[in-house]
Amino acid sequence: TVNTFADGRKFISGNRCDKPVTGKSEDNSLNLYAYKQQLLAGYKPVPGKRGSIGIPLCLNMYELLPFWHAFWTKLGFAVHTSPVSSRGLYLAGQATIPSDTACFPAKLSHGHIKALTQMHLDAIFYPCLTYNIDEGLGDNHYNCPVVAYYPEVLAGNCPELEGQKFIYDYVGIHRPKDFVHKM
């Protein structure tokens, strides 16, 4: 709400937006989200001699795509990703969502898995990750329980995964020595 006084002064209440007072327009040239989507869209499959791996662009896999794409590509696999999230992708996987209480990003992952199964890949990779990479910015680096273990939910509720190699092992990327032995 902008309150204008008799002497011309303006006072804004209810939020911190000073646009009506300063007359400055919003600067959209530094849209971090658009920049990030552009970067992630640049990760294309490189022909791999060892087969093809699918990575769903959902939950923590969205954030970790640069790492996993480089990892599997260096090992000789062609890495394919599911399409960008959309209403259509959500609707495609909606029938396999076991609970309305899951967050919307988790519900979207069902559509991502369905899209990957339709690509006829050698395997789909979506590991359970209790911890994320420790960036040293907080007290801990736990993943949300839904994010950490949702691959288990997908494995048990997506019938299209039957007959599809689905790698959803528990992996610890937070401890490099253990990671090397696990992978």
Locate predicted features.
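An N-terminal assembly and electron-transfer interface module characteristic of large anaerobic redox
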Residues: 1-183
